Amino acid sequence: MMGDYRLPDHPQPMEILNLYLGDSLEPHPGECPRETCSHEDPPEPFEEQTWATDPPEPTRQNVPPWGSGVELTHLGSWVHQDGLEPCQEQTRATDPPESTRQDAPPWGSGVELTHLGSPSAQREHRQNTASPGSPVNSHLPGSPKQNRSTSTQVVFWAGILQAQMCVLDLEEELEKTEGLKAGLKCCLPTPPVDLPGDTGLHSSPPENEDSGEDSSEPEGEGQAWLREGTPDSSPQWGAEEESMFFSNPLFLASPCSENSASGECFSWGASDSHAGVRTGPESPATLEPPLPEDTVLWELESEPDLGDGAAISGHCTPPFPVPIYKPHSICWASVAAAEGAPAAPPGHGESEGDRLGPAPSAAPCVDEALTWESGCVGSDLGPAAHPVQPWASLSPEGWQRGGPFWPQVTLNSQDRDEREGGHPQESLPCTLAPCPWRSPASSPEPSSPESESRGPGPRPSPASSQEGSPQLQHHSSGILPKWTLDASQSSLLETDGEQPSSLKKKEAGEAPKPGEEVKSEGTARPAETGDVQPDIHLTSAEHENLRTPMNSSWLPGSPMPQAQSPEEGQRPPAGDKLANGVRNNKVAWNLASRLYRLEGFRKSEVAAYLQKNNDFSRAVAEEYLSFFQFGGQSLDRALRSFLQALVLSGETQERERILYQFSRRFHHCNPGIFPSVDSVHTLTCAIMLLNTDLHGQNIGKSMSCQEFITNLNGLRDGGNFPKELLKALYWSIRSEKLEWAVDEEDTARPEKAQPSLPAGKMSKPFLQLAQDPTVPTYKQGILARKMHQDADGKKTPWGKRGWKMFHTLLRGMVLYFLKQGEDHCLEGESLVGQMVDEPVGVHHSLATPATHYTKKPHVFQLRTADWRLYLFQAPTAKEMSSWIARINLAAATHSAPPFPAAVGSQRRFVRPILPVGPAQSSLEEQHRSHENCLDAAADDLLDLQRNLPERRGRGRELEEHRLRKEYLEYEKTRYETYVQLLVARLHCPSDALDLWEEQLGREAGGTREPKLSLKKSHSSPSLHQDEAPTTAKVKRNISERRTYRKIIPKRNRNQL
């Protein structure tokens, strides 16, 4: 820093090496004269122009005091050495670095300071630090050469520093930085005071000079005092120095002081607006002891910016040289230049190129590569009120990693515009060491391959200062962050333009190409570096490394790169490995795509591929859900659309697996609504249960809104869901139930008649009869019905025992009761809406004449499969016989074979459950089945009669025996009737039921012809009153008479 007397915090040995091996040496014969100040245009007569030198990035040299009258040569390496800027009235001034000390000695007393060439400071804006009274054109020809002892001393001290840095590199101890700093302070050489002065020296402006005054000065003041044509601006290397330095293997892969960055320089200080921060007692700038007053600091001179005169304020030189490490196994000296090596060790700057200057054919090389000297900083170096802290967490193994992974990109040096045609230059290889700080001419791709650490810390881009206040990110680790799409890592990036890649130098013979575009794998974007734009070309080998196109959002105006999520409207990458080691290739995606598009699958078959508990099924489910876009939808709306795509079937845990994948997808599409996937999954399952409770066949009170909210308390990752959200979901499901998807084939079929009866009239809601309108109609007519017994033989209550007249229709195996006075003779007509009472199934039923009922004539009874008993009265006896025959024929034709009897340890008799579904067999098969059932029932009845219970046995056993006997006798009679009717049906030549009835009547009449016999009589009519004629009147005693006056009050006592 200019005028800063603080001791260095971080030593960098190559700064001292550059200090003594730089441009102070005379060029080799046949070589273009070397300049200490690089300019864009040829030199012109010096006018009033202020030359503002901006301190280089991490390379400020702590120089011991110099006597008066002592002048030192320009030292260091330079990149752009083609000429001086036109000396115009131009002011390059910014605020002086805040870390500069106020007690800096004024310029004068014969002490002048050289500008140390900093290749890393080649793209940064220059500060106008020259005072109005600075000497102009003080660099005069004929300055004396530096003596030979200076070169020997340089080699000696450089060897010591290089050895120390090698020790630090081998030990791989990060904490050695502080100890090395103290050691390097002692190793700093004290230049001899009797060195001959060089007219190319000039002193830095005073420290206490205000930046505002500098910026207001007229242009052209304080111009640098070196001219290109000066023959003695740099001493020439002798044979001894060349053999001692360039042939020494110790320095072939030595750390370099700076890396060239085209017109860029990292400022280590903050602007004056934050000057108060750095002056604290704990600041390293204030803890360093000042240098003697009779000395001035060496100022590293840098070249002007990319053509724009805007200066950057708040930049200063670091108070110490920072070491930069290179792999010692790589030799990139003159051999690499001679062989045309494609790349040199990463991070080398133009200082190395200058060391190759003694070669006759060598010339100063123009480097366009942006170098990244530093890896990860230990503290925030941003100008936002943060002092410069010592670097920490330096990883030596990260510095020495070879084999860069960054693609090699050839850049057209924009500084070729600044060269003169008469200075041919060789192109030397240069490799970029990437770091998470970007420059206007180099911005990394978001998904370019990772690069290894090339330096101890990140270097911020000056372009961030041009656009605003640079934000230097703090990195906690000692290793460079890797370039990935992770948002947490991409937050360390400064976006300014192009992509950082391995950069190459252009040969001197090429003409400048301003305005060329950056080309990277088919994606072109102009480099935003001011007036001159470099050209980047990818080689064939580099196309294999650059696999991802540049993100168009990475522009200099954006402070941070926008990391793209891998799942925004896209499926997950197919290269991920599953838990069992199976690679998730395109097999799962192809199957999911076919399931989503229903290519060869039905909606009812999709769930079977998503609900299994294995890795492949989970992968298919994840890929399947990736086709759904739930962004901006509510949870119930997204669930409705999802349930329309597939039939959610299977067991509870299988459905839960599918719903979990739905929850993951919904949370991915709407990450801000719910805190986690579990909360979405919990609410999804609650909605499914609510739909079942509100719209299912549940018995009891439905769930209320308050109960729904209460049941979800504490299930939102320990908290509660918003009540407004739960209320909206509740009323959405209550007003409209969740519709299930159905196959298209099912919707195309004609719906079967499913009568919707009131719930109160359905005594057995789970007993659903097959009501097919396509089955034939056996008979219809007017019948009076009376319910005598309910299911299981229970007596029907008194209020339901009355006789009712219905238009009865026997269709298939169902007996329908319709309204009277309407025509119901149409075949295939749906009876929905015409039924006035519950239909009765006649499967496994038996109709017989009701001989025991004498109150009404022409009455027959019907015993159903569930042991109900109905009484029907027909208009005539013929109608009664016809109804009995046709009801039994329908039962024999459509009754399926019974299930096997249940097996249990109870001795209590339980009637077997008979199937409700219709039989699918033919009449012959039905006949054989009924014969087998008849034989089985007859055998069971015979066995029961053989095993009679004991007369003195318990009453329960006797009752069980009686019930079993009645059932077996009824089953035997029923199957006998079925067999008889089916035999007559099979023997009937026509399908007409009328002809079948006539044949059946003839067979029944021949067998049932009455025989002549005596009638049984009794002496006392009162013994058998049931056999007495109905017209006989029997006078009873008053005590035997019953009146309803006494019974009704007793039965209705509680109701009165």
UniProtKB/Swiss-Prot annotation:
Principal location listed in the UniProt entry: membrane
Low complexity bias spans: 438-456
Organism this protein belongs to: Homo sapiens
Stated name of the protein: PH and SEC7 domain-containing protein 4
Disulfide bonds: none
Annotated GO biological process: regulation of ARF protein signal transduction
Coiled-coil parts of chain: 921-976
Cited SMART domains: PH, Sec7
Domain PH: 776-892
